[in-house]
Amino acid sequence: MTIALGRFTKDEKDLFDIMDDWLRRDRFVFVGWSGLLLFPCAYFALGGWFTGTTFVTSWYTHGLASSYLEGCNFLTAAVSTPANSLAHSLLLLWGPEAQGDFTRWCQLGGLWTFVALHGAFGLIGFMLRQFELARSVQLRPYNAIAFSGPIAVFVSVFLIYPLGQSGWFFAPSFGVAAIFRFILFFQGFHNWTLNPFHMMGVAGVLGAALLCAIHGATVENTLFEDGDGANTFRAFNPTQAEETYSMVTANRFWSQIFGVAFSNKRWLHFFMLFVPVTGLWMSALGVVGLALNLRAYDFVSQEIRAAEDPEFETFYTKNILLNEGIRAWMAAQDQPHENLIFPEEVLPRGNAL
């Protein structure tokens, strides 16, 4: 019996090959397989947001005006979350709530779930796009891995947190002032600024900004002069073999400033990747904890002493009183459907009163 060994070749391309050729063709804007997820989802998410902020009221869900049509501006317009009574309904246009009525769907807050879900999948599609392009040009996938940080924050804040609460109502609405309101809510109801995961997130984001500024300034300061113009930006070839700036000079400078400095570019740039991405991951993890109503730091001994001694206060006890004030004022305004009424005697007061 004869066994023939050889590479199997198809006589003609099947549908997958044809699609693969078209999707991954070299063009001005790369499409790719990831584009099948990215472009439709990004289009619908942005389109839903522009539609909602332009035309759709939040009167039926929050008792608020939230569109340009009602007199809002860019900072106050928003696509608002559904009412608390709708819990975690996906609010599909053809679902039992709207029953195919587009106007009713908008009134119920259907655009929020539409924007949130398409936005989440659009971000995932963008990360897959970075994976796909990195593989095509034989790069490492660290860009895509880094982008998982913003995705983790978006998913934890807009999806996981409200899933842990009573409904989508408690997620942020998609608007500038709406996000500010949500931040105040997080502080008042969760004491978010004293949460160690928030602290790690702040350290990561601000630390990354510091590293970025230091790195950019250092590279600019140590550029090799390679042109007769005052501006050296165009004096270098993207395919050049030699260095554009002097790592040795930069190392010597920062060694004199701090006593320590990065000795190679790999560790330096990995650190610049590690700091912000880890900060974003940690803050996302903290929001998942808040979804389960986990507490931040509680310094109970200080609270007890402040309650017993009118002359004893710390910045912590003052912040706790501020949080009580946020809850007392915000709950009644933010959740009108609960008909919350707080008597004067339960409203927070400073220890000196």
Curated annotation (Swiss-Prot):
Residues bearing the modification Phosphothreonine: T2
Listed EC numbers: 1.10.3.9
Keyword DNA-binding: no
Major location category of this protein: plastid
Membrane topology term: Multi-pass membrane protein
Residues given in the record as Fe cation binding sites: H215, H269
Listed CDD domains: Photosystem-II_D2
Binding site for chlorophyll a PD2: H198
Cofactor descriptive note: The D1/D2 heterodimer binds P680, chlorophylls that are the primary electron donor of PSII, and subsequent electron acceptors. It shares a non-heme iron and each subunit binds pheophytin, quinone, additional chlorophylls, carotenoids and lipids. There is also a Cl(-1) ion associated with D1 and D2, which is required for oxygen evolution. The PSII complex binds additional chlorophylls, carotenoids and specific lipids.
InterPro entries in the cross-refs: D1/D2 (IPR055266), Photo_II_D1/D2_sf (IPR036854), Photo_RC_L/M (IPR000484), Photo_RC_L/M_CS (IPR055265), PSII_PsbD/D2 (IPR005868)
Cellular component, GO, one term: photosystem II
Cross-referenced Pfam families: Photo_RC
Other facts: 2 of the reaction center chlorophylls (ChlD1 and ChlD2) are entirely coordinated by water.
Subunit organization: PSII is composed of 1 copy each of membrane proteins PsbA, PsbB, PsbC, PsbD, PsbE, PsbF, PsbH, PsbI, PsbJ, PsbK, PsbL, PsbM, PsbT, PsbX, PsbY, PsbZ, Psb30/Ycf12, at least 3 peripheral proteins of the oxygen-evolving complex and a large number of cofactors. It forms dimeric complexes.
Protein name: Photosystem II D2 protein
Record gene name: psbD
